[in-house]
Amino acid sequence: MSSCSRVALVTGANKGIGFAITRDLCRKFSGDVVLTARDEARGRAAVKQLQAEGLSPRFHQLDIDNPQSIRALRDFLRKEYGGLNVLVNNAGIAFRMDDPTPFDVQAEVTLKTNFFATRNVCTELLPIMKPHGRVVNVSSLQGLKALENCSEDLQERFRCDTLTEGDLVDLMKKFVEDTKNEVHEREGWPDSAYGVSKLGVTVLTRILARQLDEKRKADRILLNACCPGWVKTDMARDQGSRTVEEGAETPVYLALLPPDATEPHGQLVRDKVVQTW
């Protein structure tokens, strides 16, 4: 395959919003679309389902919790396409409200995937993003709610325009540590591991966009976070008010921003509208 070929990639794409995003990109993106999933059998079944609809996604295994798996994907993209045009970081987890798992365990597991693993994907794949590339981190307004429920000191730190990636990583580690020591409330944290993980993703988005401006401004890569809304998925126990197709609209809009677009960039977007942070 020619390294001139354009390619879009979606993580956690075998079901739910990720599957709907992949389907829409197959219809609208001019180039190959790679559907990734942790479970190979489920991923290939999802590809077959889209093929039955007349679409032609490719499959590549990806477990975002496994750095080796991320690097294997990076090497595949480099070899097959010479890089990446569109990255949609959709893979993520959430514990159900009534899950009996201790809160500190929920915090560690949720942040491991939703924040740290998503950051690892960005660390490996952002350097191979091609000029005019588009990066979309699927976040949530739960992150904004978590921010509002943080202490004033934490809110100030998360909103600070000079917060570094290292600072953010330290804050996310501190949350996990504080839950283990049962002092997270005293330390100013909210009671939602999912919310804190998505707060981390949104702030990471702001930081990475700033880094792109500093290092690769001429490449005009746009990187944003989005909230798909409360969608009927396994994660929401099918109780959401939106269909997966509706949930995919804003991520796909951000993934397909035209080449001459200069914004949004480093923003949290819902229903195609930038949210106040």
UniProtKB/Swiss-Prot annotation:
<feature type="modified residue" description="Phosphoserine">
    <location>
        <position position="30"/>
    </location>
</feature>
<protein>
    <recommendedName>
        <fullName>Carbonyl reductase [NADPH] 3</fullName>
        <ecNumber>1.1.1.184</ecNumber>
        <ecNumber>1.6.5.10</ecNumber>
    </recommendedName>
</protein>
<dbReference type="InterPro" id="IPR045313">
    <property type="entry name" value="CBR1-like"/>
</dbReference>
<feature type="binding site">
    <location>
        <position position="140"/>
    </location>
    <ligand>
        <name>substrate</name>
    </ligand>
</feature>
<dbReference type="InterPro" id="IPR002347">
    <property type="entry name" value="SDR_fam"/>
</dbReference>
<dbReference type="GO" id="GO:0005829">
    <property type="term" value="C:cytosol"/>
</dbReference>
<dbReference type="GO" id="GO:0008753">
    <property type="term" value="F:NADPH dehydrogenase (quinone) activity"/>
</dbReference>
<dbReference type="GO" id="GO:0042376">
    <property type="term" value="P:phylloquinone catabolic process"/>
</dbReference>
<feature type="binding site">
    <location>
        <begin position="10"/>
        <end position="34"/>
    </location>
    <ligand>
        <name>NADP(+)</name>
    </ligand>
</feature>
<dbReference type="InterPro" id="IPR020904">
    <property type="entry name" value="Sc_DH/Rdtase_CS"/>
</dbReference>
<comment type="function">
    <text>Catalyzes the NADPH-dependent reduction of carbonyl compounds to their corresponding alcohols. Has low NADPH-dependent oxidoreductase activity. Acts on several orthoquinones, as well as on non-quinone compounds, such as isatin or on the anticancer drug oracin. Best substrates for CBR3 is 1,2- naphthoquinone, hence could play a role in protection against cytotoxicity of exogenous quinones. Exerts activity toward ortho-quinones but not paraquinones. No endogenous substrate for CBR3 except isatin has been identified.</text>
</comment>
<feature type="modified residue" description="N-acetylserine">
    <location>
        <position position="2"/>
    </location>
</feature>
<keyword id="KW-0560">Oxidoreductase</keyword>
<keyword id="KW-0521">NADP</keyword>
<dbReference type="GO" id="GO:0004090">
    <property type="term" value="F:carbonyl reductase (NADPH) activity"/>
</dbReference>
<feature type="active site" description="Proton acceptor">
    <location>
        <position position="194"/>
    </location>
</feature>
<feature type="binding site">
    <location>
        <begin position="194"/>
        <end position="198"/>
    </location>
    <ligand>
        <name>NADP(+)</name>
    </ligand>
</feature>
<feature type="binding site">
    <location>
        <begin position="38"/>
        <end position="42"/>
    </location>
    <ligand>
        <name>NADP(+)</name>
    </ligand>
</feature>
<keyword id="KW-0597">Phosphoprotein</keyword>
<keyword id="KW-0007">Acetylation</keyword>
<comment type="similarity">
    <text>Belongs to the short-chain dehydrogenases/reductases (SDR) family.</text>
</comment>
<dbReference type="GO" id="GO:0000253">
    <property type="term" value="F:3-beta-hydroxysteroid 3-dehydrogenase (NADP+) activity"/>
</dbReference>
<dbReference type="InterPro" id="IPR036291">
    <property type="entry name" value="NAD(P)-bd_dom_sf"/>
</dbReference>
<keyword id="KW-0963">Cytoplasm</keyword>
<dbReference type="GO" id="GO:0070402">
    <property type="term" value="F:NADPH binding"/>
</dbReference>
<dbReference type="GO" id="GO:0005654">
    <property type="term" value="C:nucleoplasm"/>
</dbReference>
<feature type="binding site">
    <location>
        <begin position="63"/>
        <end position="64"/>
    </location>
    <ligand>
        <name>NADP(+)</name>
    </ligand>
</feature>
<dbReference type="GO" id="GO:0050890">
    <property type="term" value="P:cognition"/>
</dbReference>
<dbReference type="Pfam" id="PF00106">
    <property type="entry name" value="adh_short"/>
</dbReference>
<feature type="binding site">
    <location>
        <position position="90"/>
    </location>
    <ligand>
        <name>NADP(+)</name>
    </ligand>
</feature>
